[in-house]
Design a protein with these regions (language model features):
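Structural motif corresponding to the C-terminal cap of alpha-helices
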Residues: 336-348, 427, 600
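Solvent-exposed, polar/charged alpha-helical surfaces in well-ordered, non-transmembrane soluble domains
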Residues: 93-101, 209, 213, 238-242, ...
Length: 768
């Protein structure tokens, strides 16, 4: 190699070394940059995670009685829940098949609101929505709409759409229906990475154990502890308590008349699969009973591995709603009502009371309008509502009807004290005013209603007229007052208008001159509680309390207070609220009290000799049906308060087909006895002893009774003495069953002026 060639090699080597040095320098600098300057950024990328938040449902608040005993509570239950986040790449339909088979093996059901039945032999489907059910038809329309189908779409069209959307073509028809229904339910619950799907609810412990045992091979299938509404005594005021239920599609998605869609419940923090109060106090106090949901956060890495879970927000239970009702007293009144109806059936089982099988009682405190008891007969058991709904809704005795608040009845002679108050206060009569009674009212030439003259005749004053329920006296006073005047007083006393209770109640009505069938004679009929006037038992009790309070009417109410569930602290309390006042001139209310105090002496039975003075007024209004030509069935009505001179409680009673109002006298005494036992503390002990004895008897019967027989007949109450003879449609219309299973008000027929009730030989000191 010559010198020139050597120089060339050296230069090339130097170039290579320089180039290599530059590359090494760049590499070193890059390493320094990665390790020191931007290490945090790359470390974050290497450990990239995503947080997913899931709702943890808060426990619903309890409903307790005035003594703090639980009536409605949340008990622990278990749901089968699917987490899309945790399922990963699992075959969803294969997993669903496996879960369904497991649930079926344990006798469980899963959530499926698709209104389509199993395919027939030809492979065609049919809708299961009831044609006469408004809720079913709304749900059916919503289902078609959510699937993008026209309203004329058939069940086959719906299934074809589901099979296509969820690629179920390879499955047999049965499994297409099962999986299609579950997918539809998932769609309704918005199943996603951030929203789990509740597949089955309140499953058994055996099912819980089986799923947990298979957890490794069933990723994303979880058992979630939740709460279920339960009732310690399911037959205590079920109509008033109401119930909870699932959020319906119509309530979740609301479309107004302009086509605008909103999600009001979602905006309030609800999830589609939440339970919500749908009727009664459960619905009215939803905001108080519903707790504040918690949040559980699940952290997942970029490669799908769950790296952490944390309860980021602890759920807070709902508040406790405390009622004015004492459960022991309520049960005592329930039993007393059933006993009274059974007595009428066994003793007076023909004529005007041949079909006595239903009734209601309301007892309220005269001091503040708080409801102490609200009884319906027949009734039902809250704990059996879901499983026995079909039986309850078809029962001719209408156990779902809240007669105490929504039953409307002609008041009969219980209305007479209102007319007396109006006449005395307006100056039409005074203590010494009299009306001559000879048994026939002769003011009109072409209309001469009668009086049965049970124990009076001649010149009758207001006290005697109330005592003996003299129709002639009230015909004449009512005619002179006119319905405009005595109606105004009746309204202020609490009749024909809302009492103010927190839950749904019927308004009723009074007879007015604007009525289409109004005549002058209707004024005199309405003055004795006939005509078009209809009121509810809770209005009768409120009215009796207002008479007892000398014209001061309080708002009637069921809720005593709202309590903090954890501490018991009173958060809010219902204060006595005066709704109306009749000042009452002179001795108006005292004269009415004197007349009502003498009524018990005209009634056979325990009430006539009861040691505590009772002020009462019976009523025997006619029903439209007759049991013989010219002979009408009769209801038995009663208003009472006691002790008469220092009132503590007021009572309103209605017994359908009860025959005569006087037949409720023993019922008033039984209620009074229970009340005084409540006051001295013995009632709770007695109730507990009776409960233990009843449980022991049931255990004995369970050992000897055929299970099939034991499963039959769940209606609370004697269904009844003669269920086949119950025909409420004649005067008390059978309710159209609401979507939520809550009966609507029963309203009596409007009646033309009728001849006065004739004396019946089977009556206990009969009166009108």
């Amino acid at each position: 190699m010559n010198q020139d060639e050597h120089k060339i090699v050296v230069r090339r080597m130097a170039g290579l070394i320089a180039a290599a040095s530059v590359l090494i320098a760049v590499y070193v600098l890059r390493l320094i940059f990665l390790q020191l300057v931007n290490s945090d950024s790359f470390k974050s990328q290497a450990t990239n995670t995503t947080d997913y938040n899931f709702t943890v449902t808060a426990a619903r608040g309890d409903i307790v009685d005035s003594a703090g005993r639980r009536i409605a509570a949340s008990t622990t239950s278990y749901n089968v829940v699917l987490s899309k986040l945790l399922m990963g790449d699992e075959d969803l339909d294969a997993m669903l098949q496996r879960i369904v088979e497991l649930l079926e093996a344990h006798g469980e059901k899963w959530n499926d609101s698709l209104l389509i039945g199993e395919p027939d032999a030809a492979g065609h489907y049919s809708f299961t929505a009831q044609a006469d059910s408004t809720s079913d038809q709304k749900a059916l329309a919503a289902m078609k709409d959510s699937l993008g189908l026209q309203q004329y779409a058939t069940a086959d069209d719906v299934m074809e759409k589901l099979v296509e959307d969820y690629k179920l073509e390879s499955y047999p028809l049965h499994w297409q229906r099962v999986l299609g229904g579950i997918h539809y339910e998932m769609q309704q619950q918005a199943f996603s990475n951030v929203n789990n799907f509740v597949m089955a609810e309140n499953v058994s412990e055996v099912t819980v154990a089986t799923i947990k045992e298979n957890s490794l091979t069933m990723p994303g299938v979880e058992i979630v502890e939740t709460s279920t509404r339960s009732y310690d005594e399911g037959d205590i005021i079920p109509h008033v308590l109401g119930r909870v239920g699932k959020i319906t599609a119509e309530k979740w998605k609301v479309t107004d008349e302009n086509g605008q869609t909103t999600y009001p419940l979602r905006e309030k923090g609800y999830n589609m699969n939440d339970m919500i109060g749908v009727s009664g106090l459960e619905a009215v106090y939803e905001d108080e009973l519903r707790g504040k949901d918690g949040v559980e956060t699940i952290t997942r890495s970029s490669d799908g591995v769950i790296v952490g879970t944390a309860m980021t927000t602890v759920p807070e239970p709902g508040h406790t709603v405390q009622l004015t009702i004492d459960s022991a007293f309520q049960q005592a009144v329930d039993k007393a009502l059933a006993k009274n109806i059974e007595m009428i059936n066994s003793t007076y089982n023909s004529g005007s009371s041949a079909k006595a099988a239903a009734g209601a009682v309301v007892v309220i405190s005269t001091k503040d309008g708080s409801v102490l008891a609200a009884s319906n007969y027949p009734s039902y058991d809250q704990n059996l509502f879901a499983t026995q709904y079909s039986q309850y809704s078809s029962d001719p005795g209408l156990p779902l009807l809240n007669r105490a608040l929504q039953g409307l009845y002609t008041p009969g002679s219980t209305f007479k004290p209102a007319v007396a108050v109006a006449a005395l206060d307006s100056g039409i009569i005074n203590r010494f005013s009299t009306v001559y009674c000879n048994g026939v009212y002769t003011y009109y030439d072409d209309y001469r209603p009668k009086c049965t003259r049970h124990g009076h005749s001649g010149n009758i004053d207001v006290v005697t007229a109330i005592k003996w329920s003299c129709n002639i006296f009230f015909y004449d006073v009512g005619r002179r007052l006119t319905s405009d005047v005595y109606d105004a007083y009746a309204y202020k006393l609490g009749l024909g208008q809302r009492t103010g209770v927190e839950v749904s109640e019927a308004v009723g009505r009074l007879t007015t001159k604007s009525d289409s069938n109004y005549t002058a004679s209707l004024d005199v009929q309405a003055a004795i509680g006939q005509g078009n006037t209809v009121v509810s038992p809770i209005q009768l009790a409120t009215y009796a309390a207002t008479l007892a309070n000398n014209g001061t009417r309080y708002r009637t109410h069921f809720v005593k207070a709202i309590l903090d569930t954890n501490t018991g602290e009173v958060l809010s309390e219902t204060k006595p609220e005066v709704m109306d006042v009749i000042e009452g001139t002179g001795n108006t209310f005292e004269l009415v009290r004197q007349g009502m105090k003498q009524v018990p002496s005209t009634i056979s039975g325990k009430i006539s000799s009861y040691p505590v003075p009772i002020a009462c007024k019976t009523g025997t209004p006619q029903r439209s049906e007759t049991y013989a030509p010219g002979k009408h069935y009769l209801n038995a009505m009663m208003v009472a308060y006691l002790p008469a001179d220092d009132p503590q409680i007021a009572i309103g009673i209605s017994i359908e087909y009860g025959g005569y109002g006087a037949r409720t006298g023993d019922l008033v005494v039984d209620i009074a006895n229970a009340y005084f036992a409540l006051k001295d503390g013995s009632l709770a002990q007695q109730a507990e002893a009776e409960k233990e004895a009843e449980q022991a008897q049931q255990e004995d019967q369970a050992q000897t009774t055929d299970p099939a027989q034991a499963a039959a007949g769940q209606t609370t109450g004697n269904a009844a003495a003669q269920p086949a003879q119950m025909t409420p449609a004649a005067d008390t219309a059978a309710p159209e069953t609401a979507a939520e299973g809550e009966a609507q008000p029963a309203v009596q027929d409007e009646q033309q002026p009728a001849a006065d009730t004739e004396q019946n030989p089977d009556a206990i000191a009969p009166e009108n």
